[in-house]
């Protein structure tokens, strides 16, 4: 897991550096933290990083997010999720894509899960205020259980990304994806609203819901996360 995650981090750092030099990439980082003390000592830290380049013939997109919660000095949640997607553009908003994703959540019953898919993507809506992208593809998912055992399965991935510009300073986003496997189905949803504060700085409120249809005994199928973060875009 460490090598895969390190690779994602290095890629994200490299492309973010390239964005500053070439101004061809659009990138953002966001951070949220909550700390309480007294009767209850609790610390929550959330980090997200995104970078994308939309060229004439190809589109690159990379994402990394991390969450760590601790209560009374004991870690209660620690998870990472990252992906990289490359689109090869065809005519009239059509494209072929390949995508590599990796997640690590020691409290999910899995040490890690890695998936690779390739398929077809299309921009379904594109106007001054809203865009809607859809994609579908085939691939494989490899899961490492907490027991050390590994499982591989074929998957079908379906995803939609909707962006609506409410005003010059406010944007609503909705992302939905489902990876349907022969043994289990993993679905993810992110609903967010961001508002510009000043310059490149914005505040974001997001609701994330992750569901795995088949999990080890004693593990919840659905994780819900509500976060308020500051976002810096460059």
Task: Describe the predicted segments one by one.
Residues 25, 57-62, 93-96, 128-132, ...:
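Repeated loop/turn-to-beta-strand initiation elements of outer-membrane beta-barrel proteins
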Residues 27, 43-49, 64, 78-84, ...:
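Hydrophobic, lipid-facing positions within transmembrane beta-strands of outer-membrane proteins
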Residues 28-32, 48, 61-65, 83, ...:
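Transmembrane beta-strands of outer-membrane beta-barrel proteins
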Residues 29-33, 47-53, 84-88, 118-122, ...:
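Residues on the lipid-exposed face of transmembrane beta-strands in outer-membrane beta-barrel proteins
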Residues 35-43, 71-77, 104-112, 146-152, ...:
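Solvent-exposed loop/turn segments connecting transmembrane beta-strands
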Residues 53-57, 90-92, 121-126, 142-144, ...:
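Outer-membrane beta-barrel proteins
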Residues 184-234:
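Predominantly the C-terminal beta-signal and adjacent terminal strand-loop region
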């Amino acid at each position: 897991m460490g090598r895969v995650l390190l690779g994602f981090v290095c890629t994200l750092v490299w492309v973010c550096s390239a964005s500053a030099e070439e101004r061809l990439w659009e990138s953002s980082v966001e951070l949220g933290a909550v700390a309480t003390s007294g009767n209850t000592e609790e610390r929550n830290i959330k980090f997200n990083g995104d970078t994308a380049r939309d060229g004439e013939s190809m589109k690159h997109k990379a994402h990394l997010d991390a969450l760590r919660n601790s209560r009374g000095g004991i870690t209660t949640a620690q998870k990472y999720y990252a992906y990289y997607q490359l689109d090869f553009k065809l005519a009239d908003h059509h494209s072929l894509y390949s995508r590599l994703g990796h997640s690590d959540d020691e409290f999910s019953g899995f040490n890690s899960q890695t998936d690779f898919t390739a398929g077809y993507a299309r921009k379904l809506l594109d106007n001054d205020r809203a865009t809607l992208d859809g994609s579908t593809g085939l691939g494989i998912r490899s899961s490492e259980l907490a027991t050390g055992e590994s499982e591989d399965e074929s998957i079908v991935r379906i995803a939609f990304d909707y962006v609506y510009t409410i005003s010059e300073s406010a944007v609503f986003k909705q992302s939905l994806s489902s990876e349907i496997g022969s043994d289990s189905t993993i679905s993810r949803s992110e609903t967010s609203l961001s508002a510009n504060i000043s310059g490149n700085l914005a505040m974001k409120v997001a609701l994330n819901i992750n569901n795995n249809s088949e999990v080890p005994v004693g593990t919840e199928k659905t994780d819900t996360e509500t976060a308020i973060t500051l976002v810096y875009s460059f």
